[in-house]
């Protein structure tokens, strides 16, 4: 089974939850999601003590972007500020740190500035608690150009985040199926001084929303990840 279990916390911060009028429940959401994942990780570790399981809290990009305007008529407009996003992430990460999470994973990164807000929040939590938590960064690229939605190449992304001392791994998630992801993983493995992660989709959805890759197809492609320098493998959309 899995070595790392993901807590269901992807959108559990008040920026995303405000759309559903549930922002006042984010502390409870994170605490409960982490508890469920922690209990399962500990149960599996007891069954196989030679293979400890770890819990990662997934932290999504929110439904806002700091680098781009949501208003085509006003390109200078931003839906939120860097400080507002930092505060929302810090609130979420503080609960997770206090609950004993093993790893933070900032994933589906499409805007590097959003990711930098997450890194800043993690640093503040570390300063407040004295607890250092390793960070996984997982980028999603927009198309075959290999750039994020905000226009950065993977090289540029790495240059933007390498100042942070707590980064444990960088990688890719979503974007493509496993085979199509491989060229971009090679770019990361050649340039990044970290472990490399990959969480591909099960292909791309068809017109009915069904993902086209079977487990056997994904497994065959993922075997090649070893040659691409990948250390951590999971799945994204359509893979469960």
Locations of the language-model features?
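Domain-level signal for soluble alpha/beta catalytic cores
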Residues: 1-240
